[in-house]
Amino acid sequence: MLLAIDCGNTNTVFAIHDGTDFVAVWRTATEHQRTADQYYVWLQSLMQMQKIEVEITEVIISSTVPRVVFNLRVLCDRYFNCRPLVVGKPGCALPVDVRVDAGTQVGPDRLVNTVAGFTQFGGDLIVVDFGTATTFDVVDVDGAYVGGVIAPGVNLSLEALHNAAAALPHVDISMPDTVVGTNTVACMQSGVFWGYVGLVREICAQIKAERARPMRVIATGGLAPLFSQGAELFDAWVDDLTMQGLVTINSYNREA
């Protein structure tokens, strides 16, 4: 079976795919110091708890944190006896073209989202991923990745407010009941929520105007459901878009 690993700046997601569907999906904090042995013990304990008995024969990794990749490679070699595909590295081909100035600098998660978006929805697409950063990736009519936009992430903005202004508390993002807040927490939540609604709407509008044709907007990432409420920003929301993209890329390389 396939083990797909999506390592982001904040969280790392592990998913087992049986060729048809995901058998299990687990999320853990991204830690630079975690060893291959620790990863294996953690995975084995979760598999035993859920009574999952499978043999991992393939692994594919997307990582925006280069320091973590080494230990994940050791995990694959030591415990699964396989060499992983690593998106963005030699030996991992993509089923789409990358038409930007410096293709090697594009985050692998953005390329994976491009593949998944094109596979599910076709071209002329904007993929918005609400992660540590909020990214907008533009997929051409033929599926090629042609660039995008990177904005500060929602939680990053809240943390910046808290860290830079001594009087402002740490708050969690939520959809406010009203735009005008009547206390500090409500004011901060409203500013960040409606500020990001405006950011997403305007960036997508500018991309569509620049491309001069209709484009669908697809959302993914942990906070995408929140921004799908109360504001008509997206044509679709796909919770596991990145993991689906990893499965597609793995299949493409297996058949190549």
From Swiss-Prot:
GO terms for biological process: coenzyme A biosynthetic process. InterPro entries: ATPase_NBD, Type_III_PanK. A monovalent cation. Ammonium or potassium. Catalyzes the phosphorylation of pantothenate (Pan), the first step in CoA biosynthesis. The active site is at 109 (proton acceptor). PANTHER family: TYPE III PANTOTHENATE KINASE. It is an enzyme of class 2 (transferase). It is found in: Cytoplasm. K(+) binds at residue 129. ATP binds at residues 6-13, 132. Pathway: Cofactor biosynthesis; coenzyme A biosynthesis; CoA from (R)-pantothenate: step 1/5. Its main location: cytoplasm. Its EC number is 2.7.1.33. It catalyses: (R)-pantothenate + ATP = (R)-4'-phosphopantothenate + ADP + H(+). This is Type III pantothenate kinase. One of its GO terms (cellular component) is cytoplasm. The keyword Membrane does not apply. Keywords: ATP-binding, Coenzyme A biosynthesis, Cytoplasm, Kinase, Metal-binding, Nucleotide-binding, Potassium, Transferase. GO terms for molecular function: ATP binding; metal ion binding; pantothenate kinase activity. Substrate binds at residues 107-110, 184. Its cofactor is NH4(+); K(+).
